[in-house]
């Protein structure tokens, strides 16, 4: 699948699951099951519940996605 067909949306990580899977509540209210992209996995970027992330969804299955970016928190103390 080409990158132009993907839907990119932001959301909030609500739950961390085994095997680097996460449950993410999207900004539109939907909840999807996501996994980490290869670049995030390779660079050891930690994703925890409460983090804001960018998620890529396939138009064929809107219940599963891939986390492509962890957004910086607005709180500068962490």
Curated annotation (Swiss-Prot):
Q: List the disulfide bonds.
A: none
Using the record for this protein, list the coiled-coil segments as residue ranges, or answer none: none
A molecular function GO annotation: ribosome binding
Domain S1-like: residue ranges? 1-72
Q: Which GO terms describe its cellular component?
A: chloroplast; cytosol
Keyword Ubl conjugation: yes or no? no
Q: Which InterPro entries match?
A: NA-bd_OB-fold (IPR012340), RNA-binding_domain_S1_IF1 (IPR006196), S1_domain (IPR003029), TIF_IF1 (IPR004368)
Keywords, alphabetical: Chloroplast, Initiation factor, Plastid, Protein biosynthesis, RNA-binding, rRNA-binding
Give the subcellular location.
Answer: Plastid, Chloroplast
Provide the primary localization. Answer: plastid
Membrane-spanning parts: none
Pfam families registered for this protein in UniProt: eIF-1a
Q: How does it assemble?
A: Component of the 30S ribosomal translation pre-initiation complex which assembles on the 30S ribosome in the order IF-2 and IF-3, IF-1 and N-formylmethionyl-tRNA(fMet); mRNA recruitment can occur at any time during PIC assembly.
Q: Which PANTHER family match?
A: TRANSLATION INITIATION FACTOR IF-1, CHLOROPLASTIC (PTHR33370:SF1)
Q: Which HAMAP family match?
A: IF_1
Task: Write out the similarity annotation.
Answer: Belongs to the IF-1 family.
What this protein is reported to do is described as: One of the essential components for the initiation of protein synthesis. Stabilizes the binding of IF-2 and IF-3 on the 30S subunit to which N-formylmethionyl-tRNA(fMet) subsequently binds. Helps modulate mRNA selection, yielding the 30S pre-initiation complex (PIC). Upon addition of the 50S ribosomal subunit IF-1, IF-2 and IF-3 are released leaving the mature 70S translation initiation complex.
Know the name of this protein?
Answer: Translation initiation factor IF-1, chloroplastic
Please give the organism.
Answer: Chara vulgaris (Common stonewort)
């Amino acid at each position: 699948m080409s990158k132009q067909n993907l839907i990119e949306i932001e959301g909030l990580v609500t739950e961390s699951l085994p095997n680097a899977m996460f449950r993410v509540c999207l900004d539109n209210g939907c909840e999807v099951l996501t996994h980490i992209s290869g670049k995030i996995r390779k660079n050891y970027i930690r994703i925890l519940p409460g983090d804001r992330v960018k998620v890529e969804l396939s138009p064929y299955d809107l219940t599963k996605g891939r986390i492509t970016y962890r957004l910086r928190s607005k709180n500068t103390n962490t």
